[in-house]
Curated annotation (Swiss-Prot):
Fusion peptide, as annotated region: 274-315
Gene giving rise to this polypeptide: G
Glycosylation site positions: N63, N109, N139, N192, N196, N202, N221, N230, N235, N321, N328, N388, N438
Name used for this protein in its record: Envelope glycoprotein p57
Pfam families for the chain: BDV_G
Annotated source species: Borna disease virus (strain V) (BDV)
Residues on Cytoplasmic side: 489-503
Gene Ontology cellular-component terms listed: host cell endoplasmic reticulum membrane; host cell plasma membrane; membrane; viral envelope
GO biological process: clathrin-dependent endocytosis of virus by host cell; fusion of virus membrane with host endosome membrane
Functional description taken from the UniProt entry: Unprocessed envelope protein p57 is thought to be involved in attachment of the virus to its cell surface receptor. This attachment induces virion internalization predominantly through clathrin-dependent endocytosis.
Domain of life of the source: Viruses
UniProtKB keywords: Clathrin-mediated endocytosis of virus by host, Cleavage on pair of basic residues, Fusion of virus membrane with host endosomal membrane, Fusion of virus membrane with host membrane, Glycoprotein, Host cell membrane, Host endoplasmic reticulum, Host membrane, Host-virus interaction, Membrane, Signal, Transmembrane, Transmembrane helix, Viral envelope protein, Viral penetration into host cytoplasm, Virion, Virus endocytosis by host, Virus entry into host cell
Signal peptide: 1-22
Length: 503
């Protein structure tokens, strides 16, 4: 009996609904080992109006081209291991991985011991050092472009490759690895055009903006010159109107609320230079999430990056379907599953292999397309939450009255009833991260690197007592075996000489 059409349609709809519920969460998979894109954010174009203050300028610039170039990538690492053997049998080890920047022939694959013995008056320690060097040589393909950064690599950051290194055929990357390739000479064609630009008249210096380049340039005596573009504007002062004087305002009734200050500072909010300073100050120092600002500013949802002096350092990502896992560890970011592997989803929606620590019991509200609430170390997956989508009316008294629905309970006494928080200390719940003292390594993305803190595992009095008793038992057993070996031949000879004892 064949199934009916309505059954098939219903079954297909159910499968689609279940799949949508399963993959309702998405994360960004990003390759930050690749070369980032450097984009001038042009925050000065924030108040740019294409139809006002238009002037004609003569522009001469270099045409941009991109080619692929085969290369050989060489990466060498030196593995350093130093083992300390204590007098009582305990030991400790320091493991360090360093980048080797010498020649491949100089990267020896044999061990090199040093400091065979160290001893002083209170303990005796044997330190043995072993160093092994390994190199990986890979054939790769890179992209060379006529504008900086001149080289793009998907396996490493090639932003530091200069034009001279392109012509020499060898370059050292920022991570210490090297690239060898056929020497290449950059060549660009000069393009001359007459373009319409917009003069920003509310700036202290004359700035012309071109929509064709999405860039603005500061004019000095009507011209701008650089290695890649030359701009000459003849009538750059004729289209600007004189500035209006700001009116004196009554500042005696100003209060600290933002809605009271906003009308007073209306002229300041409209000033592009002040907005530029605010944006660069907030997002250029790492205080706020620069990736969220870059996505809104560049109108691209699948990028991450940071801002350095008005220039966005951006990586392209792609969205993948992930699912929450049980939050059973002391991690600040929630664990997620992607293709059977465990990752951590940070606040910017990016998948990471590492995460900061957090105290157990910390509740976190997160935004991943929807609001989610999860508790660190609870063993429960984060769940979606909803909120009342109404805004308050900007009056402090009514704002407090509308939200006065939480019982007034002492935070310290309330948290002391939680045994986990009490074990960590009642003051620790004020910090999102735990004060960890056992982390002596840092993940840099290319490998596990030890930062060189010494190890004192041999300073263990209980271990000394245990080893001393073990040595005493071992010595007693040896002495018993020696006495037994000495007495057995004598007893055999005595029995042979006297015979067996009889009544």
């Amino acid at each position: 009996m064949q199934p009916s059409m309505s059954f098939l349609i219903g079954f297909g709809t159910l499968v689609l609904v279940l799949s949508a519920r399963t993959f309702d969460l998405q994360g960004l998979s990003c390759n930050t080992d690749s070369t980032p894109g450097l984009i001038d954010l042009e925050i000065r174009r924030l108040c740019h109006t294409p139809t006002e203050n238009v002037i004609s300028c003569e522009v001469s610039y270099l045409n941009h081209t991109t080619i692929s170039l085969p290369a050989v990538h060489t990466s060498c690492l030196k593995y350093h291991c130093k083992t300390y053997w204590g007098f009582f049998g305990s030991y400790s080890a320091d493991r360090i991985i360093n980048r080797y920047t010498g020649t491949v022939k100089g990267c020896l694959n044999n061990s090199a011991p040093e400091d065979p013995f160290e001893c002083n008056w209170f303990y005796c320690c044997s330190a043995i050092t072993t160093e092994i060097c390994r190199c990986s040589i890979t054939n790769v393909t890179v992209a060379v472009q006529t504008f900086p950064p001149f080289m793009y690599c998907s396996f490493a950051d090639c932003s530091t490759v200069s034009q001279q290194e392109l012509e020499s055929g060898k370059a050292m990357l920022s991570d210490g690895s090297t690239l060898t390739y056929t020497p290449y000479i950059l060549q660009s064609e000069v393009v001359n055009k007459t373009l319409n630009g917009t003069i920003l008249c509310n700036s202290s210096s004359k700035i012309v903006s071109f929509d064709e380049f999405r860039r603005s340039y500061s004019l000095t005596n009507g011209s701008y010159q650089s290695s890649s573009i030359n701009v000459t504007c003849a009538n750059y002062t004729s289209s600007c109107r004189p500035r209006l004087k700001r009116r004196r305002r009554d500042t005696q009734q100003i209060e600290y609320l933002v809605h009271k200050l906003r009308p007073t500072l209306k002229d300041a909010w409209e000033d592009c230079e002040i907005l530029q300073s605010l944006l660069l100050g907030v997002f250029g120092t790492g205080i706020a999430s620069a990736s969220q600002f870059l996505r809104s500013w560049l109108n691209h949802p699948d990028i991450i990056g940071y801002i350095v002096n008005g220039v966005g350092v951006v990586w392209q990502c792609h969205r993948v379907n992930v699912t929450f896992m049980a939050w059973n560890e002391s991690t600040y970011y929630p664990p997620v599953d992607y293709n059977g592997r465990k990752y951590f989803l940070n606040d910017e929606g990016r998948l990471q292999t590492n995460t900061p620590e957090a105290r157990p019991g910390l509740k976190r509200v997160m935004w991943f397309g929807r609001y989610f609430l999860g508790t660190v170390g609870s063993g429960v997956k984060p769940r979606r939450i909803r909120y009342n989508k109404t805004s308050h009316d900007y009056h402090l008294e009514e704002f407090e009255a509308s939200l006065n629905m939480t019982p007034q309970t002492s935070i310290a006494s309330g948290h002391e009833t939680d045994p986990i928080n009490h074990a960590y200390g009642t003051q620790a719940d004020l910090l999102p991260y735990t004060r960890s003292s056992n982390i002596t390594s840092t993940d840099t993305g290319s490998g596990w690197v030890h930062i060189g803190l010494p190890s004192f595992a041999f300073l263990n009095p209980l271990g000394w007592l245990r080893d001393l008793l073990a040595w005493a038992a071992w010595l007693g057993g040896v002495l018993y075996l020696i006495s037994l070996c000495v007495s057995l031949p004598a007893s055999f000879a005595r029995r042979r000489r006297l015979g067996r004892w009889q009544e």
